[in-house]
């Protein structure tokens, strides 16, 4: 009887050890697979200068692209930049079309239910942008007006929730700025940083409304990865923190933005 019980205990322990090992191995799978492939597939819209856009050589470049490439290099792999519409970018991640989303994505409770975030890797503020000569002076003046937003981003959700705005969604900032200048929209809602950088290059005259109490006045943006990958998340977080500490992040930020936006 004792021998039988001992045998059962040994068998149970073996099963437990095997299960623990299998779980640990499964959790490490994505990081291990990534390293085995030698490639980190990084998704972004490619329509969001200066964070991601296509240059004259048909290469996707910008702050997000450079951050993705730097993280990949420190992981010991090469970055493969994949462009995809922002409104379907999380679905593509969950479908394993790429490994990470470096696309200026605001960290929200709703998104955290679907993905894990590395970061924040920068902070930004919600801006209401109008033409310099617009009669719109405050948030309340937008009542009944047409506002432009990026399809699928947090600002689109905010604008639609106001209930008093006509919301027009776009694939990216360049189209919005063209329509703002032409009067096809009265304002646009998005992160302040890319707007200021874009108009500095184009010379377009705009004004940002003073909205100190607006929801989302300062938001954190993160790098999205699939859930249940603790090793990958920890490794990428460590890489990002090292970049923030050793000057690599600041160098990238100064190149594309002109300031440190951490």
Give short role names for the model-derived ranges.
Residues 21-28:
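Sec/Tat signal peptide C-region and signal peptidase I cleavage site
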Residues 130-147:
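Flexible hinge/capping segments at coil-to-helix
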Residues 40-41, 76-78, 95-103, 146, ...:
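Alpha-to-beta junction loops
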Residues 52-56, 68-77, 139, 152-171, ...:
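Ligand-binding cleft/hinge of the Venus flytrap
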Residues 29-104:
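Extracytoplasmic small-molecule ligand-binding "clamshell" domains
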């Amino acid at each position: 009887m004792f021998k039988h019980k001992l045998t059962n205990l040994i068998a149970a322990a073996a099963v437990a050890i095997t299960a623990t090992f299998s779980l640990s191995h499964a959790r490490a799978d994505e990081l291990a697979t990534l390293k085995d492939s030698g490639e980190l597939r990084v998704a972004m819209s490619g329509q969001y200068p200066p964070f991601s856009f296509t240059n004259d050589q048909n290469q996707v470049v910008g702050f997000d692209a450079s951050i993705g490439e730097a993280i990949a290099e420190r992981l010991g792999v090469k970055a493969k930049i994949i462009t995809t519409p922002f409104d379907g970018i999380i679905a593509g991640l969950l479908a394993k079309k790429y490994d990470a989303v470096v696309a200026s994505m605001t960290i929200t409770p709703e998104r955290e239910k679907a993905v894990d975030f590395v970061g924040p890797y920068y902070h930004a503020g919600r801006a209401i942008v109008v033409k310099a000569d617009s009669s719109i002076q405050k948030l309340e003046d937008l009542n009944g007006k047409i506002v432009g937003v990026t399809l699928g981003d947090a600002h689109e959700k905010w604008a639609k929730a106001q209930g008093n705005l006509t919301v027009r969604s776009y694939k990216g900032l360049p189209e919005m700025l063209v329509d703002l200048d032409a009067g096809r929209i009265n304002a646009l809602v998005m992160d302040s940083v890319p707007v200021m950088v874009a108009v500095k290059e184009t010379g377009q005259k705009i004004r940002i409304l003073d909205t100190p109490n607006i929801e989302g006045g300062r938001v954190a943006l993160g790098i999205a990865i699939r859930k249940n990958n603790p090793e990958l998340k920890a490794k990428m977080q460590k890489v990002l923190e090292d970049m923030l500490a050793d000057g690599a992040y600041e160098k990238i930020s100064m190149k594309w933005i002109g300031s440190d936006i951490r």
